[in-house]
C-alpha cells in the first residue's frame, strides 16, 4: 500500500495540478494579451471563457495526427512525449513545501534535466524533414545551450550564498531576507535567462511566425502538437517556481505547509504574469543580439560574480567579528 502511494498516487498528485495550471496559464495568457490590446480575449466558451482551455485540449486531441510522408516515424512521435516527460519530471525536487523526491543535489538535477530538453527540440526539428523546422530547431538548440551557461553560473553563485544544493536549503537561507535584495543583479540576469531558456518573447526566435511559420513544431498537428504545447507551458511554470524558490524564498511554517504552497504558487503566478507582460510589450530580438547578450554581457558578469561570492567569505573569514 505504501509503495502504491509513493510510486503512483504521489506523482499523480503533482502531475495533475501542473497540467491543470498549464491549461489555465494558456487562458490567462490569451486574456492578458487581449486586455493589453484593448479587446476581451476568449469569452464564449463557458463563463468569461473559463472553459476555453478544455475546449482547446479536446479539439487538439481528437484531431488526426498527420505525419509528413518523408519524416522519421519513430523520432517524430517520440520527441513530443520526451518533451512532456522531461517537463513533468523536473517538478519532482520542487519544495512545495515538501518535494516528491528530496534530492541532495536538487539544483543540479533541475539543470541537467532542463538541458536534456534540447534533445526533444533537436529530434523533432530533424525528424520533421522540413527546412523551416530545421532552421527553427538549430536556433532553439543554439539559444538554449548558450543560456544554459549563464543559468549554471548564476545557480553556482546562488548556491555559494546559500550554502547547499538542496532546494529545501533555500527556504532556510531566506528566512530573514529574500535573496532578491542582496543579489538583485543575479536575479535580473536569471529572469532574463529563463525567458530565453523557455523560448518566450522577446527571445522566441525558434517560433518566429513572421519568418519561420511556427518553428521546430511546424509539421506537428493534433496530439503531438498539444504535447509540445503542454511541455512549453509546464517549463514556463517550472522556471517561475524555481525563480520564486531561489530568490523569493517562501517562508515555511511547518505547522501549516499549505500556506507555504499557497505562498509559492502566488509568487510563481505573478512571475508568470510578468512573462506575459514582457511578451505583450517587447519586439523579438535579432539572432546576433540574442547571442551578444549572453556571451558578451551575461557570461563575463556572472563569472565575475561567482568569483566575488567565492572571494568574499574567504577574505572576511580571517577578520575578527564586530570590526
UniProtKB/Swiss-Prot annotation:
Its EC number is 7.1.1.2. It is a multi-pass membrane protein. Its main location: mitochondrion. It catalyses: a ubiquinone + NADH + 5 H(+)(in) = a ubiquinol + NAD(+) + 4 H(+)(out). The chain crosses the membrane at residues 8-28, 74-94, 105-125, 145-165, 176-196, 236-256, 258-278, 298-318. The keyword NAD applies. GO terms for biological process: aerobic respiration. It comes from the Eukaryota. One of its GO terms (molecular function) is NADH dehydrogenase (ubiquinone) activity. It is found in: Mitochondrion inner membrane. Keywords: Electron transport, Membrane, Mitochondrion, Mitochondrion inner membrane, NAD, Respiratory chain, Translocase, Transmembrane, Transmembrane helix, Transport, Ubiquinone. GO terms for cellular component: mitochondrial inner membrane. Core subunit of the mitochondrial membrane respiratory chain NADH dehydrogenase (Complex I) that is believed to belong to the minimal assembly required for catalysis. Complex I functions in the transfer of electrons from NADH to the respiratory chain. The immediate electron acceptor for the enzyme is believed to be ubiquinone. Belongs to the complex I subunit 1 family. PANTHER family: NADH DEHYDROGENASE SUBUNIT 1, NADH-UBIQUINONE OXIDOREDUCTASE CHAIN 1. This is NADH-ubiquinone oxidoreductase chain 1. It comes from Oncorhynchus mykiss (Rainbow trout). The lineage of its organism: Eukaryota, Metazoa, Chordata, Craniata, Vertebrata. The gene is MT-ND1.
Amino acid at each position: 500500500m505504501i509503495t502504491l502511494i509513493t510510486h503512483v498516487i504521489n506523482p499523480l498528485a503533482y502531475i495533475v495540478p501542473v497540467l491543470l495550471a498549464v491549461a489555465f496559464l494558456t487562458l490567462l495568457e490569451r486574456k492578458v494579451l487581449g486586455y493589453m490590446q484593448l479587446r476581451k480575449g476568449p469569452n464564449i466558451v463557458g463563463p468569461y471563457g473559463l472553459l476555453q482551455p478544455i475546449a482547446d485540449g479536446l479539439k487538439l486531441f481528437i484531431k488526426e495526427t498527420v505525419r509528413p510522408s518523408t519524416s522519421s516515424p519513430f523520432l517524430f512521435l517520440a520527441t513530443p512525449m520526451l518533451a512532456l516527460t522531461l517537463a513533468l519530471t523536473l517538478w519532482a525536487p520542487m519544495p512545495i513545501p515538501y518535494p516528491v523526491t528530496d534530492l541532495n543535489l536538487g539544483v543540479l538535477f533541475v539543470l541537467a534535466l532542463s538541458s536534456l530538453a534540447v534533445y526533444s527540440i533537436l529530434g523533432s526539428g530533424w525528424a520533421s524533414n522540413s527546412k523551416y523546422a530545421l532552421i527553427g530547431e538549430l536556433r532553439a538548440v543554439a539559444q538554449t545551450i548558450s543560456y544554459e551557461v549563464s543559468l549554471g553560473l548564476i545557480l553556482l553563485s546562488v548556491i555559494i550564498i546559500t550554502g547547499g544544493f538542496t532546494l529545501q536549503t533555500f527556504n532556510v537561507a531566506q528566512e530573514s531576507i529574500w535573496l532578491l535584495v542582496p543579489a538583485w543583479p543575479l536575479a535580473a540576469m536569471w529572469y532574463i535567462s529563463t525567458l530565453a531558456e523557455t523560448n518566450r518573447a522577446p527571445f522566441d526566435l525558434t517560433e518566429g511566425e513572421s519568418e519561420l511559420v511556427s518553428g521546430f513544431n511546424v509539421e506537428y498537428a493534433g496530439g503531438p502538437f498539444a504535447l509540445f504545447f503542454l511541455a512549453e507551458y509546464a517549463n514556463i511554470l517550472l522556471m517561475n517556481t524555481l525563480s520564486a524558490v531561489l530568490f523569493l524564498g517562501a517562508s515555511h511554517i511547518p505547522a501549516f505547509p499549505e500556506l507555504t504552497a499557497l505562498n509559492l504558487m502566488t509568487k510563481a503566478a505573478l512571475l508568470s504574469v510578468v512573462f506575459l507582460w514582457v511578451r505583450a510589450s517587447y519586439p523579438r530580438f535579432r539572432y546576433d543580439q540574442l547571442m551578444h547578450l549572453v556571451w558578451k554581457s551575461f557570461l563575463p558578469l556572472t563569472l565575475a560574480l561567482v568569483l566575488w561570492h567565492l572571494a568574499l567569505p574567504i577574505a572576511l573569514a580571517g577578520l575578527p567579528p564586530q570590526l
